[in-house]
Amino acid sequence: MIKNEQEHFMKEALKEAKKAYEKLEVPVGAVIVKDGKIIARAHNLKETKYDTTKHAEILAIQKASKKLKSWRLTDCEMYITLEPCSMCAGALINSRIKKIYIGALDNKTGAAGSVLNLFDDYTFNHKVEVEKGIMVEQCELSLIHI
């Protein structure tokens, strides 16, 4: 994928992170792309919904699955402003998503290499491609209030 496209989609994820910030949530945003088009977007709603599972990645997976009428997101990619936690990494693996693009790393709960790496565990029946370093500075800046 061309860098400009990657930045375009990460900017869309950052717009979602801003929505989370405005709701006093941890400012994380995610978008799911299929065939070069955004099919789902979401931001953290854990505080708003009083539900620890309402992470941006989970919500985006749910929206994309509903839109595609399938839990298998094999031809989809996700752009995430913050490295996913183990819960979200598990959901990404189970959704069969093709690839994820990560902005900022998470040294507290990151499950794509910062704390542990579920995506490199070859015992799972699906392998998610991971690309890190997309608009890192902007994604880190979106987290400053934490």
Q: Which positions does each model-derived feature cover?
A:
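Helix-adjacent hinge/juxtasegments
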Residues: K54, I58-I93
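Histidine-centered active-site/metal-ligand motif
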Residues: H43, H55, H126, H145
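Residues at secondary-structure transition points
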Residues: N4, P27, E47-H55, E83, ...
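Short beta-strand scaffold segments in enzyme catalytic cores
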Residues: V28-V33
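Short beta->alpha transition motifs characteristic of CBS
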Residues: I39-K46
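Zinc-dependent deaminase
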Residues: M1-K23, W71, P84-I144
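Residues that line or immediately flank small-molecule/substrate-binding pockets and catalytic motifs
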Residues: K46, I80, A104
